[in-house]
Structures are given as structure tokens and as C-alpha cells.
Amino acid sequence: MTLTQEFDTIAAISTPLGEGAIAIVRLSGTDALKIAQSVYKGKNLTQVASHTINYGHIFEEKRLVDEVMVSVMRAPKTFTREDIVEINTHGGIAVTQEILQLLLRNGARLAEPGEFTKRAFLNGRIDLAQAESVMDLIRAKTDKAANIAVKQLDGSLSKMINNIRQEILESLAQVEVNIDYPEYDDVETMTSQMLLEKTAHFEQLLENLLSTAKRGKILREGLKTAIIGRPNVGKSSLLNQLLREEKAIVTDIAGTTRDVITEFANIGGVPLELVDTAGIRETDDLVEAIGVERSKKALAEADLVLLVLDASNELTDKDLELLELSKNSNRIVLLNKTDLPEKIDSTQISGDFIRISALKNENLNAVEEKINQIFFAGEIEAKDATVLSNARHISIVEEALKALKEANSGLALGLPVDLIQVDVTRCWQLLGEITGEAAPDELITQLFSQFCLGK
């Protein structure tokens, strides 16, 4: 995107394309009001008060296109800090596309993906971490993932990072003064021991932040969960209960699920990417055999394994094989079909297990509790905590920590403070990439290109 494009007027459809009650076509830029007025009949939009909604009609010359409500928001109190117009039309592909084309013909440019949010960032309305949280909020699959995104949009992570960077900067400034003006007696000398204490403090702050990454990443991206078991033990029934809808075929015929079915479920605020695998068994059916191989691959890649056993039958060699195959995984063993007389010998199962009836939806809440225990130590969400959830942020904090550890190692070896300053400065610069203070232009462009059109 060139510099001249940054401040022209852009337009895009901000709601998903398709049939619906309402769609929104958004304009942002210096000429937003003038361009909207050129296709609108009603009150003069260039003269109405800011943050008002106005009733009128969109015309192509003399032909009526739609009856609309138009929101007018004047700079700088807008999302982009530019003039913004939002045209609320009747939902539908044809009418929204026609209105968008009218705006483009009258001087607007089609916005690039994420360009509205990018302008908010470039105009100082939000920082880079807050911009990324906008997309996290849009993509959140559970209320807890949304809560993390909202807190970051409100600036919780940015404030923490900025505070740490400020502390680091003050230490660096003191070192710099000592180096450049050694004759100054009124400035305290930063000794190796003093700097070691400070870098150890910074290291602890980042360690504490990084300790939230596992929980945050799971809540943001979900747990890849493989449902495995012999054919006809109730895997598809379990999938349907967890999804609260029928996605998999449930029959008494072994081998009904011949492929891998993937769906997302919200289990106590944790997004589970549920993979209902084909029953793992020996088979001559080529299609089913491919499904079995995919099942084994899903097991190897899973964050969580739900191993389903048929409690109404004795354990088979295949059951024992699956127990052995999954023993080193984050595994929950489920004894299904407890609505039938129990025949399974549970003493042959090492570790914990949960008795359930997928058919009757009995005791599935125990599965939720076990997931919480395995991945969150019983506390899925710490109130008011700043949580790292974005993979880019996690990687940066890890690199910043590495720089601090190198600084501490150098201090322990007796290296002079001015040499250690290089590693501490690198830590400060890396943390600036989270908020965008030190992010290269290429990174910023790449990040916003991942946004949806119209946001």
C-alpha cells in the first residue's frame, strides 16, 4: 500500500455476504460524507451532526436502489479517526454489491483486507496488539476466548508490555549516561550487580506473562481432540452429544464412520476441535482402510485423546492395543454404554476413567471437569489476568526472555555493563514489536492482510 493510498477514502461491505435482514457498507476517509451524499437522498449528510443515524434512500441517478439508514461519525471520534459513514441496507448480495459499486464509481476505493483496522493503528487509535485482538474477537469460538480478546482490545496486554519496556528503558538510559558522561558525580553508577538485579526482575515479569501462554493459546485456538476407539463403541454418539446436534451417522453397523469428521464444540468455554475418527481395526475395505490410517494420524497429532471403550462388553485385544497406543497422550478414557449391564473389567485399565452414556447424555459433565483438570489445573480462567494467547506474541516474549538470559549469563561471567547493554536493548526492541512501536512495515502489512474484508 503506497503512502498516497493511506488517506484516500475507502469502502467495503462490513457484514458477511449472503441473505440477511441487514447489511452494512462502510466508508472511511476525508471524502466519506461527500461520496455517500452523492448517492443518497434524505438529509444532507455533510451537514448532519456527528454520531447520528439518518433515514433516506440510495439512488443510481433516478433509479431507487434501496431504503436505508445511514450512520454518520465525524473524525476524530471514530474507529479509524477519520470520517466514517455506515450505510445500513437490506441484507442480500445484489443490493449490497450495487451500493458498494455506486460508492466506488463516485470516488471511493475498495478497501484492502483489514484496512479499516490498519488505519485505526496508523492514526494512533489502537496499537498493534489491540488491532490483532479485533480479529481474535471476531474469530473467538467461546465466551472465554472472547473475554481474553476484549481485555486485550481494552489495552491490558499493551499496558503491561509498555510498563515493562519503560522500566527497561530507564535502566538502559542510566547505563548510557554512565558510559557517555563518566565524569557526572550526581548520576548513580549502574554496577554489574545492580543491572543483574534489574534484568532478573525483568526476566521474572516476562516469565510470569509467558506462564499464561498455554492457557491463552488453548482458549484462542482450541484443543485438537481425537475421539478414538473400536468400531461401534459409541464415538459418533459422543461426538453428537458434545456438539449438541447430529453430525455423525449413528448405527449398529461397524465401520459406519469411514472417514475423519472434524467439528468445533464449546466444552465449558474451551473450544475443542473434535475429530471423530474411523474405528481403528483391520479391514479389507479400501475406503475404510484410508479412514483408519487417518485416524492413527489424528491420534498422533491430537492435543487431547478421548478413548471410548464399550462398557457393555469385555475388553478386546484391539481395546488393549489402543490403551497402549494412547498411554503417553493427554488421554481421557471413557467407559461408554453405562445404560447397559456392565461387562468390562475396569481393573485392566491403568489410570483414571469416566463412566458415561453417550446415548443418554449421562455424566458428560465429568469430561469437562477432567479437561479443566488436565490443561488448566482446575482453574480455566484467572479473573482480571493478562493472558498471552497470540502465537506471535508468545514467540516474541520467548525471544525477549532469551535475550535477558544471555545478559544475565554475561553479567555472571563478569562482562562489562556496556556489552550487556546490547542484549537488554534487544529485549526492549523485541517487546516493541508486540505493540507496534518497533514493528517493521513488512510485518504490519502481513498482519493486516490476514483480516477479513470490511474490518
From Swiss-Prot:
<keyword id="KW-0479">Metal-binding</keyword>
<keyword id="KW-0819">tRNA processing</keyword>
<feature type="binding site">
    <location>
        <position position="257"/>
    </location>
    <ligand>
        <name>Mg(2+)</name>
    </ligand>
</feature>
<dbReference type="InterPro" id="IPR004520">
    <property type="entry name" value="GTPase_MnmE"/>
</dbReference>
<dbReference type="Pfam" id="PF01926">
    <property type="entry name" value="MMR_HSR1"/>
</dbReference>
<comment type="function">
    <text>Exhibits a very high intrinsic GTPase hydrolysis rate. Involved in the addition of a carboxymethylaminomethyl (cmnm) group at the wobble position (U34) of certain tRNAs, forming tRNA-cmnm(5)s(2)U34.</text>
</comment>
<keyword id="KW-0378">Hydrolase</keyword>
<keyword id="KW-0630">Potassium</keyword>
<feature type="binding site">
    <location>
        <begin position="276"/>
        <end position="279"/>
    </location>
    <ligand>
        <name>GTP</name>
    </ligand>
</feature>
<feature type="binding site">
    <location>
        <position position="455"/>
    </location>
    <ligand>
        <name>(6S)-5-formyl-5,6,7,8-tetrahydrofolate</name>
    </ligand>
</feature>
<comment type="similarity">
    <text>Belongs to the TRAFAC class TrmE-Era-EngA-EngB-Septin-like GTPase superfamily. TrmE GTPase family.</text>
</comment>
<dbReference type="GO" id="GO:0005525">
    <property type="term" value="F:GTP binding"/>
</dbReference>
<dbReference type="GO" id="GO:0046872">
    <property type="term" value="F:metal ion binding"/>
</dbReference>
<dbReference type="InterPro" id="IPR031168">
    <property type="entry name" value="G_TrmE"/>
</dbReference>
<dbReference type="InterPro" id="IPR005225">
    <property type="entry name" value="Small_GTP-bd"/>
</dbReference>
<dbReference type="InterPro" id="IPR018948">
    <property type="entry name" value="GTP-bd_TrmE_N"/>
</dbReference>
<dbReference type="InterPro" id="IPR006073">
    <property type="entry name" value="GTP-bd"/>
</dbReference>
<feature type="binding site">
    <location>
        <position position="26"/>
    </location>
    <ligand>
        <name>(6S)-5-formyl-5,6,7,8-tetrahydrofolate</name>
    </ligand>
</feature>
<dbReference type="InterPro" id="IPR027266">
    <property type="entry name" value="TrmE/GcvT_dom1"/>
</dbReference>
<dbReference type="Pfam" id="PF12631">
    <property type="entry name" value="MnmE_helical"/>
</dbReference>
<dbReference type="GO" id="GO:0003924">
    <property type="term" value="F:GTPase activity"/>
</dbReference>
<feature type="domain" description="TrmE-type G">
    <location>
        <begin position="222"/>
        <end position="376"/>
    </location>
</feature>
<feature type="binding site">
    <location>
        <position position="86"/>
    </location>
    <ligand>
        <name>(6S)-5-formyl-5,6,7,8-tetrahydrofolate</name>
    </ligand>
</feature>
<keyword id="KW-0342">GTP-binding</keyword>
<feature type="binding site">
    <location>
        <position position="253"/>
    </location>
    <ligand>
        <name>K(+)</name>
    </ligand>
</feature>
<feature type="binding site">
    <location>
        <begin position="251"/>
        <end position="257"/>
    </location>
    <ligand>
        <name>GTP</name>
    </ligand>
</feature>
<feature type="binding site">
    <location>
        <position position="251"/>
    </location>
    <ligand>
        <name>K(+)</name>
    </ligand>
</feature>
<dbReference type="InterPro" id="IPR025867">
    <property type="entry name" value="MnmE_helical"/>
</dbReference>
<keyword id="KW-0963">Cytoplasm</keyword>
<keyword id="KW-0460">Magnesium</keyword>
<feature type="binding site">
    <location>
        <position position="232"/>
    </location>
    <ligand>
        <name>K(+)</name>
    </ligand>
</feature>
<feature type="binding site">
    <location>
        <position position="236"/>
    </location>
    <ligand>
        <name>Mg(2+)</name>
    </ligand>
</feature>
<dbReference type="GO" id="GO:0002098">
    <property type="term" value="P:tRNA wobble uridine modification"/>
</dbReference>
<feature type="binding site">
    <location>
        <position position="256"/>
    </location>
    <ligand>
        <name>K(+)</name>
    </ligand>
</feature>
<dbReference type="InterPro" id="IPR027368">
    <property type="entry name" value="MnmE_dom2"/>
</dbReference>
<keyword id="KW-0547">Nucleotide-binding</keyword>
<dbReference type="InterPro" id="IPR027417">
    <property type="entry name" value="P-loop_NTPase"/>
</dbReference>
<feature type="binding site">
    <location>
        <position position="125"/>
    </location>
    <ligand>
        <name>(6S)-5-formyl-5,6,7,8-tetrahydrofolate</name>
    </ligand>
</feature>
<dbReference type="GO" id="GO:0005829">
    <property type="term" value="C:cytosol"/>
</dbReference>
<dbReference type="Pfam" id="PF10396">
    <property type="entry name" value="TrmE_N"/>
</dbReference>
<comment type="subunit">
    <text>Homodimer. Heterotetramer of two MnmE and two MnmG subunits.</text>
</comment>
<dbReference type="GO" id="GO:0030488">
    <property type="term" value="P:tRNA methylation"/>
</dbReference>
